[in-house]
Amino acid sequence: MNITIHSGNWEELDVDALAVPLAKGSTVDAALDARLGGLPGELIDTGEFTGKAGACSLIHRVPDSAVKRVFLIGLGEAPMARHWFAAAGQAVRAAAKAKCRSVALLLPPDACARLAAEGAGFGQHRPSGYKEQKPWPVEEVILLTTGDQSIADAGRITAECVNLARELVEI
């Protein structure tokens, strides 16, 4: 799985899904909400999405957008570094379940990009046991934040090494 950092706008990208992590009690950026047809704000207003850690809501067919799906990922009440790690892993697993080839994860500038890259890499791990597995559908994760590509590479490499160790232990 390829993990990259992109500092531009998500609309510039050709991705199957966009993951938007949100803290409990927060609202979606007004411009982003308007661009997504007001659907994220509606999910929050109706209480269908609360922002609770581990929460995930899926929006299908965003109007006038190349993005097919938008995932709202809950960060909990006071997001810390570990929450960005968990949100990235959850976004990758949700994208895989929806059979998306690529997913962009919207991160604020103060988020830890390396932990998000590690979380995305950990999110693709599946215990293999002795059975043959279907190919992993997610090929690309794009972290929408500022930073150098070496940060994402370090997180990806760490996740690959840990996942390899997990596989060796399972044998």
Regions found by a protein language model. Give the residues of each.
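Short amphipathic alpha-helical segment within the helicase RecA-like ATPase core
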Residues: 1-171
